[in-house]
Amino acid sequence: MESQQLSQHSHISHGSACASVTSKEVHTNQDPLDVSASKIQEYDKASTKANSQQTTTPASSAVPENPHHASPQPASVPPPQNGPYPQQCMMTQNQANPSGWSFYGHPSMIPYTPYQMSPMYFPPGPQSQFPQYPSSVGTPLSTPSPESGNTFTDSSSADSDMTSTKKYVRPPPMLTSPNDFPNWVKTYIKFLQNSNLGGIIPTVNGKPVRQITDDELTFLYNTFQIFAPSQFLPTWVKDILSVDYTDIMKILSKSIEKMQSDTQEANDIVTLANLQYNGSTPADAFETKVTNIIDRLNNNGIHINNKVACQLIMRGLSGEYKFLRYTRHRHLNMTVAELFLDIHAIYEEQQGSRNSKPNYRRNPSDEKNDSRSYTNTTKPKVIARNPQKTNNSKSKTARAHNVSTSNNSPSTDNDSISKSTTEPIQLNNKHDLHLGQELTESTVNHTNHSDDELPGHLLLDSGASRTLIRSAHHIHSASSNPGINVVDAQKRNIPINAIGDLQFHFQDNTKTSIKVLHTPNIAYDLLSLNELAAVDITACFTKNVLERSDGTVLAPIVKYGDFYWVSKKYLLPSNISVPTINNVHTSESTRKYPYPFIHRMLAHANAQTIRYSLKNNTITYFNESDVDWSSAIDYQCPDCLIGKSTKHRHIKGSRLKYQNSYEPFQYLHTDIFGPVHNLPNSAPSYFISFTDETTKFRWVYPLHDRREDSILDVFTTILAFIKNQFQASVLVIQMDRGSEYTNRTLHKFLEKNGITPCYTTTADSRAHGVAERLNRTLLDDCRTQLQCSGLPNHLWFSAIEFSTIVRNSLASPKSKKSARQHAGLAGLDISTLLPFGQPVIVNDHNPNSKIHPRGIPGYALHPSRNSYGYIIYLPSLKKTVDTTNYVILQGKESRLDQFNYDALTFDEDLNRLTASYHSFIASNEIQESNDLNIESDHDFQSDIELHPEQPRNVLSKAVSPTDSTPPSTHTEDSKRVSKTNIRAPREVDPNISESNILPSKKRSSTPQISNIESTGSGGMHKLNVPLLAPMSQSNTHESSHASKSKDFRHSDSYSENETNHTNVPISSTGGTNNKTVPQISDQETEKRIIHRSPSIDASPPENNSSHNIVPIKTPTTVSEQNTEESIIADLPLPDLPPESPTEFPDPFKELPPINSHQTNSSLGGIGDSNAYTTINSKKRSLEDNETEIKVSRDTWNTKNMRSLEPPRSKKRIHLIAAVKAVKSIKPIRTTLRYDEAITYNKDIKEKEKYIEAYHKEVNQLLKMNTWDTDKYYDRKEIDPKRVINSMFIFNRKRDGTHKARFVARGDIQHPDTYDSGMQSNTVHHYALMTSLSLALDNNYYITQLDISSAYLYADIKEELYIRPPPHLGMNDKLIRLKKSLYGLKQSGANWYETIKSYLIKQCGMEEVRGWSCVFKNSQVTICLFVDDMILFSKDLNANKKIITTLKKQYDTKIINLGESDNEIQYDILGLEIKYQRGKYMKLGMENSLTEKIPKLNVPLNPKGRKLSAPGQPGLYIDQDELEIDEDEYKEKVHEMQKLIGLASYVGYKFRFDLLYYINTLAQHILFPSRQVLDMTYELIQFMWDTRDKQLIWHKNKPTEPDNKLVAISDASYGNQPYYKSQIGNIFLLNGKVIGGKSTKASLTCTSTTEAEIHAVSEAIPLLNNLSHLVQELNKKPIIKGLLTDSRSTISIIKSTNEEKFRNRFFGTKAMRLRDEVSGNNLYVYYIETKKNIADVMTKPLPIKTFKLLTNKWIH
């Protein structure tokens, strides 16, 4: 601040009668914030140095020829307040005072310029430069020494300097603000010193060294009046001048007093922060020093609490005191007094054993720390020290403090307290000395050590007849068993261990000895005055000294509390070692270690563990007998009680004695379980259970939420049920303290009904054991039932209810009765019960047609509460019904050896149990149903393996002509309904409803076979069947080929070589050749089974002949054909070898669907298959390593089973609920804080670079006038909403430079301080890629620019203040912002508006509509990304012209001008671009990935081989619960964020081939299982292996008259969680890939065609926007094309038949697509699936296919 103030006024010139001298203005780059606490002590010195180093330009200091020419006073120096300046004159040292120098009655009448009146003023000579201050000037405010009377300078030395050489005086600067007055006073005092007036400056006591003369008073007044205008004076100065306007001395005196106080505070803070203590000085002196500093700071308003003070003290401890850092740092309530207690004890022990010579040597294997216990009757002291360092500091202590601890030749001056060796110290409490008084032992101020004891001292006791001491270190000639009886004042015996001599070595160098008794059982060390008197020593309490009768002073006495003390340092230590002293003890208990000490020493272990460890010698140095165990049993350690606090223990059976008085149904336990996630809306998410205490009867009720009204309804129901059914009244309900139970609504309800709520205590779930155990039991049963039955999870509550019914009927081992028996109910009739999930057939009493089947397959759940029926789940209708019209599905097969639940049945047992129930299906109906069952619902594989000796035709009762099995073998099996013993589908539609309503009348007759050439799974080979089969003929078609289908399955005549379609092997009987079944995609299966309504791509009836294929509409005109050829010609599509068309025989058309059995979510999707993979032999290439599709046992009959939901893979769920106590996920931080980059940075070179960057940033902030430097604001005066924190962040840029940035904490910015409507725009990546593509095709020059500190060019409109960073130490000050600082919410928008306005108005650019940050004119295109600019132009001079205009306003740096005709390399927004005009452009990130990927800690190349694809089909992500602790979970989530973040950045920039894998793994960031991490590692590994790959562009043919913009679309149907489809699009401009997108469809599609329509609808808007951009940047005509491999989608888009739009949403979407295609001249064409490069966006592909689709555009 001061140097800044000086620089602002350094242009003041010295005007005189003989010269006009001007000084060069000095600019400074000092950071106004950089005033940290560490620099306070240097502040005055730095201020003086700044004054002394101000220089002038030699050329401007020349003196005019006429020495008597008077120049006018500069305008910057205002005239005196009482009038203008009179005629000026000058004076030299060798001349007499002029006439104007005489004293006048009023000082304002003096006719001279004040600084010319200084006795030290000299005019400059003709050839001399402007005078400078001496380079070394003492600080004017330094504390005076006792010898010098002047505070600031020695006048005699100044006079001698004045006689030897001329000294020129510069005037002080002008005062411009009241806040600058303290700094101005310093410069003014310096001015007086240099003017030889240092003697009149007041000292610290307020009085000057000499009397001020009248002339000097006049000079003082006038200079003060001129350079300190009254309007800028502080209030307290004005108050002084209002009393006496000439009392400048009083102002100076008070200013010095204030400055001294500030300096003292700064010095105290620095001293406290740099404390050092190793025992070389007395502990009481160190304590006095510290406590005085703390007291002074507290008195001055700087509060230092105990925690901070203790930390500062402990940080400075060294030597034997260092261990206190580790023994004390865990204590939360530690005080300074307690810390000094241990310091005094160690010092006392250290001094006592300084000269002792131990008579034992420690074994090196002994423990490092030696523990000693010092017992005290008031408070024991426990000391732990290192005996190996006992005498290390001996010589050092003696030299530093003249304290002798040796018996050999003590010096005369040892331990003397003299003024010459003691520095003065200031104390601020009642025990302190006056200013300048010396510190003596009689005035030591101590804190309480133990009660009122003064550590390290002996208490002078006039009533004691003997001297007693607790420590044996000072006893000479000790002897044990003295036989002396000693009693205290209360007549209690004091056991004496030894007697000896106590030897004193006083400061007069005399030695004295008295008798002393040793005992550890006293509170103080007592020194008997009677025994001192016996050796001619008395205590004088008036002088506070011990003296002899002749008046010789021996030692000072210290008064502490109510007693007088003498220091132990006058005692001579004995030569007795510690073990010898222990042998002197006679009491066994006094020689043992106290248990509390051992307990604390051994990490607070319990007494039993410690005793066992000592007994087994696992702890050495002392034995079990060395510890006093008497207090171990009853000892309560407060730290253990706090640190090891646990919940109270529950005694088994303790609950019963409180509830014996209750009758049945009077005492209930209740609890709520939930929520269960990822369920349809109709399914309950919670259940509430009730248990009767007496009978243990249970009730469960489903809940959809935990609202008060929902809970109240259940309570009302259960209370009414108990009252009416059991004639009982509930008296007490026990529950936990959840908000659902403690709300006011339920509390009032219970109070109204007279029920007492009994709540558990806080966090005591074990007290609620009855309800908790019931919930656990029911959930265990639920999981088991769902696993056994295979039913979907949304039926979980049905399993709970089934378990409740059974559990109420089972007897308890304790009571020998069931809950139903205790309640007086009959036992459960098991004949009415079915196994949970038992397959049944339910009668459809209201079919659509008389010829439709009457049976619907379902699963039995539990008996109905409201009827005599059974609750049965019908998957095909997605409903549950309450009915008695059902029949159990039976079968004889079972495979107990494999424990196959799907085959395991107990039909005979079920028949016996249900014998009394008659089936609604007649015997002839059973036979008839079996005859119609032409498609088996069994797993072919399992059927053949179960009965190899008797193969059974599972397709039909008829026998194949080629089947060798006689028809009679099937007769017995055909008499009963075929068993459908399979698992139910795991997942169903989320909109499934649970109701008791049977299917409605309006239903589709049969499932519709959809387009066989489906593309959702990657496409199939074209089959020789109708693509759009008529719905009315589908049944006939299937029926007519039943026998053919059957014949095919049992025929050996079919050869694998007849088709290229993927075949699945099926085991045959008796060693016959394997039969093959063509693989049919899951999409086809779903269409055949699920869809009841007409297919969206259904067309009018056509001939069923396999030779008639319905063609897709194609362009009929020659122009359209040419356009199609033109669009497809330049695309980077794969080159495929020609293949001959293959037709499947008719039997293939009627094969039942075969589903892939999958239990996990697939990385590649559900049931993905690929059209490019052909299996013509048993051997398979490594590149075609697809997972082999197996025949599913879950295949259901599509005719008789009525569209049962096919099995699907499990949902991919982010099971965050399984993670225990996850609170927050911290974002990833890539920058460093100030303390990390500079303060604690151990890398010196890096630290220096960051410091350099820091100063560079500070200078830039000052240069840009980022804030108002004229005023600092008090934090209390500003609205907190407008105050924003700030910080410095540091990072290393990609080019290796180190960057520092001063930013605001916009993340905590208040919403009222910015306009949320303003947006910060940057160039879209598609816009940049489009511009680069056009630049290549048109031979443009590409120039890259950077604008330094861009945001700081934008002004800020709002009134905002920032708080300086913490490391600057200005916590209470604020600065008002003037510029848009980085980090503010509005900074980006302000900069965007600023640069946008400049580009439009000054550079003649215009922004492209719809594409922010893209500007153009007739010659130049600009892409703006914050402060980076990319210029495109055909003429390089046009770019240079824009650069010249930008440099007029902004600090613009040219990164790459782009003028070379050779290959030029760019780094544009992370893309490494190689560009040669007119030839090619390559985009990659090799250097960046080479640097970043190794830092991710991913194991690269673990097997030493490179991956060929980022993933493979057939990989599935398990949904097992993620049991992991919070810290590990956060760590893994952070790792996933880093890995997926980098992958997303790379994929979005140019690696579009990775987007599908990135998108899929990004959905699992919050589910970081081991499997997910491994898949992510594999993706990063592939990126590492292919880091050198580049997106290759070549210049378009010059003959092309048009720009061609193409979007290639693809979709993968239902391969994402919740049956969502994956859609993908790739965009190409003139054959160059400029962008790609892979995402999950926002809505659930019900067919492949719908998914394709959704994908196309996502591509068209962006295609139109890109078309507009291309037309704006390049005036060529443009052709827009859209390619898809779905012919049905093209047919619907081009069709005018609105009947195809069979549902509201997709019908509307398809109609909109049709309008957009026709209205935007968009060409839609078909592309073969094999050539669809967008396939990589929607599914995982085999290596061969992946390479085939990508090697044309990225390699």
Curated annotation (Swiss-Prot):
Q: Binding residues for Mg(2+) 2, per the UniProt record?
A: 1346, 1427-1428
Report the principal subcellular site: cytoplasm
Q: Which UniProt keywords apply?
A: Aspartyl protease, ATP-binding, Cytoplasm, DNA integration, DNA recombination, DNA-binding, DNA-directed DNA polymerase, Endonuclease, Hydrolase, Magnesium, Metal-binding, Multifunctional enzyme, Nuclease, Nucleotide-binding, Nucleotidyltransferase, Nucleus, Phosphoprotein, Protease, RNA-binding, RNA-directed DNA polymerase, Transferase, Transposable element, Transposition, Viral release from host cell, Virion maturation, Zinc, Zinc-finger
Reactions catalysed, semicolon-separated, are:
DNA(n) + a 2'-deoxyribonucleoside 5'-triphosphate = DNA(n+1) + diphosphate; Endonucleolytic cleavage to 5'-phosphomonoester
Q: Where does the chain bind Mg(2+) 3?
A: 1610, 1652, 1685
Tell me the subunit arrangement.
The capsid protein forms a homotrimer, from which the VLPs are assembled. The protease is a homodimer, whose active site consists of two apposed aspartic acid residues.
What this chain does, per the entry, is described as:
Capsid protein (CA) is the structural component of the virus-like particle (VLP), forming the shell that encapsulates the retrotransposons dimeric RNA genome. The particles are assembled from trimer-clustered units and there are holes in the capsid shells that allow for the diffusion of macromolecules. CA also has nucleocapsid-like chaperone activity, promoting primer tRNA(i)-Met annealing to the multipartite primer-binding site (PBS), dimerization of Ty1 RNA and initiation of reverse transcription. The aspartyl protease (PR) mediates the proteolytic cleavages of the Gag and Gag-Pol polyproteins after assembly of the VLP.
Provide the domain comment: The C-terminal RNA-binding region of CA is sufficient for all its nucleocapsid-like chaperone activities. Integrase core domain contains the D-x(n)-D-x(35)-E motif, named for the phylogenetically conserved glutamic acid and aspartic acid residues and the invariant 35 amino acid spacing between the second and third acidic residues. Each acidic residue of the D,D(35)E motif is independently essential for the 3'-processing and strand transfer activities of purified integrase protein.
Q: What is this protein called?
A: Transposon Ty1-GR2 Gag-Pol polyprotein
